[in-house]
Amino acid sequence: MKITRFEDSFEDIEGWQLARELTRQVYAVAMRGAFAKDFGLRDQITRASGSAMHNIAEGFDGGSNAEFTKFLRYSQRSCSEVQSQIYVALDQTYITQEEFDAIYNQAALTHAKVGGFIRYLLNTPNPR
């Protein structure tokens, strides 16, 4: 689903779509094997990936670009948190290098896309 307009719904925002994929990837590895039994790490990383998604949705309903960008920055921080936590999963051999690379890169892509959207909002008066 590639939608170029974002006025109608948070689901239209490409950054949210990427964060959703990040969350899907995180859950796919976190709910299996030894990773699933490491409740602390599993809960932290699934919450962080979900937060990347949910903050975009929450900010979308804000009343101003400034408020929206605040939540978008929270989303970016959550992406960075996933990147840090996925190192722990790799170091504990819960995941393969290939899985690490996919999740790390998805978090980086999401972070960058959300950053571009922040710049757009800061330079566009009332885009909605």
Question: What do these predicted regions represent?
Answer:
Residues 1-128:
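Short, C-terminally biased terminal segments at protein or domain edges
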